[in-house]
Amino acid sequence: MAKLTKRARLVRDKVEATKEYDFNEAVALLKELATAKFAESVDVAVNLGIDARKSDQNVRGATVLPNGTGKEVRVAVFTQGANAEAAKEAGADIVGMEDLAEQVKKGEMNFDVVVASPDAMRVVGMLGQILGPRGLMPNPKTGTVTPDVATAVKNAKAGQVRYRNDKNGIIHASIGKIAFESNQIEENLAALIEAVKKAKPSSAKGVYIKKISLSTTMGAGITIDQASLTAAS
């Protein structure tokens, strides 16, 4: 049997796998257990009461976190003309059309988010096999295919998170850094949960949000008592 690392032993001793923790207690535990030498992200996993095999029950969208993600986001925009100038003024890192597509084909993708105006999708559409697997393909549901590219750029820079459930009906997202204050993490989580609730498929039956777990980049998941979320704010 492999030896447990010092951190793994600490997690085992501190975190009860079956317990639902008060939100503030959970964040305090995460901070105590965050021993990595880099600024760890705070990640959330939201288990949904959906049948992920049915396309009409899949949940997808985007929301801007009130306190940002703590990450510097690089944004590439596929557009032209006046929209190109608007994107640059809004803070886009790279703006182009066919020239940007050529960079992508060469594997030069020094960006975290891709935005496209509708007229640019003829170019972006040919990059689906490259951008899709990396989670970078623009989509109207996440606000990244839009005629208002300037707002999309500003949202991305302000800490917008894009979310979608995986094949097990779980949404994974980063909602800040471990250095954030507890109330900042709670406000970000509340914004994400509110957006996910609004995106509830009409065909989903029963309990919609079944479980919420928080973890850090290198840490174990801690299940949150949902009743404590409103009490924490």
Swiss-Prot record:
GO terms for molecular function: rRNA binding; structural constituent of ribosome; tRNA binding. SUPFAM superfamilies: Ribosomal protein L1 (SSF56808). It comes from the Bacteria. Keywords: Repressor, Ribonucleoprotein, Ribosomal protein, RNA-binding, rRNA-binding, Translation regulation, tRNA-binding. The keyword Protein transport does not apply. The keyword rRNA-binding applies. Binds directly to 23S rRNA. The L1 stalk is quite mobile in the ribosome, and is involved in E site tRNA release. Protein L1 is also a translational repressor protein, it controls the translation of the L11 operon by binding to its mRNA. Part of the 50S ribosomal subunit. This is Large ribosomal subunit protein uL1.
